C-alpha cells in the first residue's frame, strides 16, 4: 500500500461498563495512532453493526475485529490487533 493512502475505519456502537450502547472512539485511539504513524489518512464512518471495527482500503474490507478486543486508549504499539490491522492495510492493493 502506498504511503498516505486513504483508509476508511467503519465502527459500530458498543456498551461499556453498563453505559448505554452508542458509538465511541476511545478504543479506536491506538489503531488511529498506528495508521497515522504510517502516514495514512483515516476517515471515520459510523455503522449500525454492534461491536464491529472494519478497515476498508479501495472499497475492500482488509481487516475486521470486535471493538471490545482493542485496548482502551494508548498508542496502539503494544496492541496485537493494531499490529495485525497495520499489516493488513500495508498489504492492501
UniProtKB/Swiss-Prot annotation:
InterPro entries: UPF0728
The organism's place on the tree of life at top rank: Eukaryota
Name under which the protein is recorded: UPF0728 protein C10orf53 homolog
Family indicated by similarity: Belongs to the UPF0728 family.
Transmembrane segments: none
Amino acid at each position: 500500500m502506498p504511503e498516505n493512502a486513504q483508509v476508511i475505519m467503519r465502527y459500530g456502537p458498543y456498551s461499556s461498563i453498563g453505559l448505554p450502547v452508542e458509538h465511541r472512539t476511545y478504543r479506536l485511539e491506538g489503531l488511529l495512532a498506528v495508521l497515522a504513524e504510517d502516514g495514512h489518512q483515516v476517515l471515520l464512518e459510523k455503522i449500525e453493526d454492534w461491536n464491529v471495527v472494519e478497515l476498508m482500503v479501495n472499497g475492500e474490507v482488509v481487516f475486521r475485529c470486535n471493538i471490545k478486543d482493542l485496548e482502551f486508549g494508548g498508542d496502539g504499539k503494544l496492541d496485537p490487533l493494531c499490529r495485525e490491522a497495520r499489516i493488513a492495510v500495508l498489504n492492501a492493493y
